[in-house]
Regions:
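Solvent-exposed loop/turn segments at secondary-structure junctions
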Residues: 27-28, 48-49, 58-61, 115-117, ...
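Sec/Tat-exported extracytoplasmic proteins
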Residues: 9-11, 24, 31, 53, ...
Length: 186
């Protein structure tokens, strides 16, 4: 039982001096002067309770920290357009960054490929829970996003190889071609 907190309830309401009862990791009641019962009590006077935060652009698990080559799988930089790769296949659930994010209140994370490619692949939305596999972290029913980057990263990565795109106009030309190819594929 968390007592005397300033609570933001996720609907825009602020509740001062509020109580929040949590059972088995889920909020089961909220209000003021809730009965304690057999619950452990935490005095949260001067502290805030908020819904879990959602990180909509993260590279946790695909660029693990501390970084070593074996866990740096965020960019498939073999072609400027790698729409067929999925970030979830590179997620390392033991990345210590997940625990750090959770300690800061981040409970849901969209993991995206890096920005080295024009079209870097599909992202995945995960629940930030301790797990041994990314499948155990997947957020049920979450939509997938497609990572696209238009700017410094693709033109730097490929320009340094004397390959297109090496300019922003090359970036946009690459998008046009990728979209035309996708239309033809349909």
């Amino acid at each position: 039982l968390i007592r005397n907190a300033t609570v933001l309830d996720g609907t825009g309401r602020r509740l001062d001096g509020a109580d929040v009862l949590i059972r088995d990791g889920k909020i089961v009641d909220g209000g003021t002067a809730l009965p304690q019962g057999d619950a452990t009590t935490i005095d949260a006077k001067g502290r805030w309770v908020t819904p879990g935060l959602i990180d909509v652009h993260s590279h946790l698990g695909v660029y693990a920290s501390p970084g070593v080559n074996a866990t740096q799988d965020g960019n498939e930089m073999t072609d400027p357009v790698t729409a067929g790769v999925w970030a979830e296949h590179s997620v390392w659930p033991q990345d210590p960054g997940f625990a750090t994010a959770l300690a800061g209140g981040v409970t849901t994370i969209q993991i995206l490929p890096g920005s080295g490619n024009l079209i870097g692949g599909r992202g995945v939305t995960l629940r930030n829970v301790p797990a041994t596999t990314y499948q155990a972290m997947k957020f049920p029913g979450a939509l997938q996003g497609l990572k696209m980057a238009c700017g410094e990263n693709p033109k730097r990565v490929y320009g340094e190889r004397n390959q297109a795109p090496s300019t922003r106009m090359g970036n946009v030309a690459g998008y046009r071609q990728a979209f035309a190819d996708a239309t033809d594929y349909q």
